[in-house]
Amino acid sequence: MEGSGEHGETSKGPLSKGVSRGLCILDLIFRVIAVIGTLASAIAMGTTNQTMPFFTQFVQFKERYSDLPTLTFFVVANSIASAYLIISLPLSIVHIIRSRAKYSRLILIFFDVAMLALVTAAASAGAAIVYLAHNGNVSANWFAICQQFDSFCERISGSLIGSFAAMVVLILLILLSAVALARR
């Protein structure tokens, strides 16, 4: 009965290695998905602008993401998170090859949490501005601009989707890394 694996003991056999390798592959897949989400959000927001003529072609109103510092923060934060995630991809591949690496996984968890905080702050700030763009604020006499700049608003609203998706994937990455460390 000693080798039966009862009473909370875990097996270090081939099945355990297969599960660890599976967790590492899932980590790599999640990182690629998070790169796509953050990079797409940064590009979509960073290339957003719309020009609207006012009475004549000589007088025009132009709306750009860079007109609002919050949206600039959104682009920078998602770019930083995307760069980090791209840099972390080789380390994630190393974990597939050497699934016993403990310290590098701890470093990844630390930076994953920092990137989660950064992306959460950026997505939340961006969502507040998008809400104001769609609805305005009557008490502050801020008018909704989305009725005039519809293309601009569609793009900034769409860029939030990738950022919030990346947030969810980063949470899953942190949980996955915690499970992988707990299995050691």
UniProtKB/Swiss-Prot annotation:
> What would be one Pfam family of this protein?
CASP_dom
List where in the cell it is found: Cell membrane
- Residues annotated as glycosylated are N49, N137
Which ranges does the record mark as transmembrane?
A: 23-43, 73-93, 106-126, 160-180
Which protein is depicted?
Casparian strip membrane protein 3
This protein's assembly is summarised as:
Homodimer and heterodimers.
Chief localization: membrane
**Which intervals lie on the Extracellular side per UniProt?**
44-72, 127-159
Species, as recorded: Brachypodium distachyon (Purple false brome)
